[in-house]
Amino acid sequence: LRCLVGSEMCIRDSLIMAHNNWKILEKLLILLDDKRNDIYLHIDLKSDFIDFSSKVHNANLFIFHEIDVRWGDISLIQVEFFLFKTAYCKGNYSYYHLISGSDLPLKTQDEIHAFFDAHYPTEFIGFSLGMTCDNRINKVYIFPKYQRIKNRYGNKVLCLLRSFCVFLQNLLNYNHYKLQDKLMIGPEWVSITEQSVSLILSKEKIIMKQYRFASCGDEVYKQTIIGNS
């Protein structure tokens, strides 16, 4: 589950992605229910649609049930772009908070708003400096939608096929990533300004092309775009 919470200088925008843990999601929405917040919630298309509108009375809540999201697949990036773009079109948010439906705020809304108002326009995005992610993006991972399937034996077969395919690409020195940007990795959850969201959206076409066969590219593309800007 992913959620985007947005705000207009004093109104925040929350983008949420969700697929289960409905009780936690319900609690999250209640804690975010503040007139200064706009909440954009995407529920995985594989999951049953649940209307949480009755749980939110002060914030503006927008619920979407559009994309079949698969672990490690380009669909994770697609749903993030969907949320960023939908919120950006409304515009005038000082911060876009991309969070999981399993997250809960540890501070009150007054404390959270005061913190981000005091630190604007700082970008809050994590970088795992000791990790390398080149092989995640440089190589083509076959059957990216099926990196985690319920059939244990099928998982093993697909894992072996992917490993063999990557081995051949290494042998042939094949590099799928054609951009000059240095690849960077970090957590997918961020709190970023409208300026950064605009920059990310301007790269949509090339990101969808370059990350189509990547593994867990959602942990790479935002850090790479912002880190190289």
What is the predicted function of each stretch?
Residues 16-24:
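Active-site beta-to-alpha loop of glycosyltransferases that engages the nucleotide-sugar donor
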Residues 27-38:
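Short, acidic, metal-binding catalytic loop of nucleotide-sugar glycosyltransferases
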Residues 37-48, 65-66:
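Short beta-strand/loop segment that forms part of the nucleotide-sugar
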Residues 96:
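Short aromatic/hydrophobic "clamp" motif used to bind/position activated sugar donors
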Residues 159-229:
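Catalytic core and acceptor-binding pocket of nucleotide-sugar-dependent glycosyltransferases
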